[in-house]
Regions:
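Short, surface-exposed beta-strand/strand-loop-strand elements in extracellular ectodomains
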Residues: 64-88
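An anionic, turn-rich surface loop/hairpin at beta-sheet edges
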Residues: 81-103
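Beta-rich globular "head" domains
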Residues: 36-73
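C-terminal interaction-tip segments
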Residues: 3-14, 120-139
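Solvent-exposed, flexible loop/coil segments flanking beta-strands in beta-rich domains
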Residues: 2-47
Length: 139
């Protein structure tokens, strides 16, 4: 089996930011889905491609199961081991714009800079995850 995933869907995009939505219904086996694919985003007007994404705001709902397994993570993709950006549990809204957002990891390792939604292997079949995130485009 596989998770039932709707999206990611770009809700709004300009040269400075992008808003992306994804809905994931777990099959109980966990999984990783590319949420923010930097290579698929619109380049700047001068042709410069997006290199990284910085998290500005996130609306989320991670519900179902017995409560101990209804969490998800946003990670920055890296072939040396993904780099956690933020963990999500329950439902809520976080706004990081006051201090410029959660910056992208720009280390010199093999960072691919895509953002992944990670659902744990402990998730119950039927757990629902809805994430809407606003990212700053970093060139």
């Amino acid at each position: 089996m596989a998770d039932t995933v709707t999206g990611p869907t770009i809700l709004q995009q300009n040269d400075k930011r992008v808003v992306i939505k994804i809905v994931n219904q777990s099959d109980g086996s966990g999984g990783t889905t590319v949420f923010g694919d930097v290579s698929a985003l619109d380049a700047r007007e001068d042709g410069t491609a997006v290199a990284h994404l910085g998290l500005l705001r996130v609306w989320y709902s991670c519900q179902g199961g017995d409560g101990g397994d209804s969490y998800a993570r946003l990670d920055e993709e890296d072939s040396d081991g993904d780099i956690p950006i933020i963990g999500l549990t329950g439902a809520g809204y976080w706004d990081f714009r006051e201090f410029g957002g959660i910056p992208a990891d720009k280390s010199s390792n093999s960072n691919q800079s895509d953002v992944n939604l990670v659902v744990p292997g402990a998730a119950d079949d039927g757990n629902m995850y809805t994430i809407i995130a606003e990212f700053q485009k970093i060139y």
